Amino acid sequence: MTSNQLAQYIDHTALTAEKNEQDISTLCNEAIEHGFYSVCINSGYIPLAKEKLAGSNVKICTVVGFPLGANLTSVKAFETQEAIKAGANEIDMVINVGWIKSQKWDAVKQDIQAVFNACNGTPLKVILETCLLTKDEIVKACEICKEIGVAFVKTSTGFNKGGATVEDVALMKQTVGNIGVKASGGVRDTETALAMIKAGATRIGASAGIAIISGTQDTQSTY
């Protein structure tokens, strides 16, 4: 796989609280320069990213219910609508992990369905936070996502105790079939990214995108 091909797997990510306008501007410039698929940013920076990415092919991805997923469903749906109105091209929502742990599967499904409906055709990725789930819970969550028809299931926020693993990516891909799988959290070098893709990942979320495509190791990135 060439570096240009690998770049098209990457959502170039900056989600930590301290990121300032210059950081986001740099992120956008890097995404254009290296041909990344998208930038993944908090929704408050969508207008800035829209301005910086004008005329390019780079998409704007934003997060909803991030990073805990425990918001009211109505708030997630509203957040989604506002983000799309501002210019988001893709939505990454966090599943309600607490409801999964409470076995409230109907509520989990309704939560995702509400955001899916609010997307109104905008691609939706559902973050499972796999490090907190059992294998059975991962499968069940993936089955719900597949039934609803979301665009992707995603491993992690990158803000919890663990990120993507090859094992979890393979399990997710096996469960969802043709739906996309996004590996995120801890993917910081070419070898790891390629292992995730081999396991079934069709998108990589990373703040170390430049290191991934250049074959270097990034020890500074947090996502």
Curated annotation (Swiss-Prot):
One of its GO terms (cellular component) is cytoplasm. The active site is at 92 (proton donor/acceptor), 154 (schiff-base intermediate with acetaldehyde), 182 (proton donor/acceptor). Keywords: Cytoplasm, Lyase, Schiff base. It catalyses: 2-deoxy-D-ribose 5-phosphate = D-glyceraldehyde 3-phosphate + acetaldehyde. Transmembrane segments: none annotated. It comes from the Bacteria. GO terms for molecular function: deoxyribose-phosphate aldolase activity. Coiled coil: none annotated. One of its GO terms (biological process) is deoxyribonucleotide catabolic process. SUPFAM superfamilies: Aldolase (SSF51569). Belongs to the DeoC/FbaB aldolase family. DeoC type 1 subfamily. HAMAP family: DeoC_type1 (MF_00114). This is Deoxyribose-phosphate aldolase. The gene is deoC.
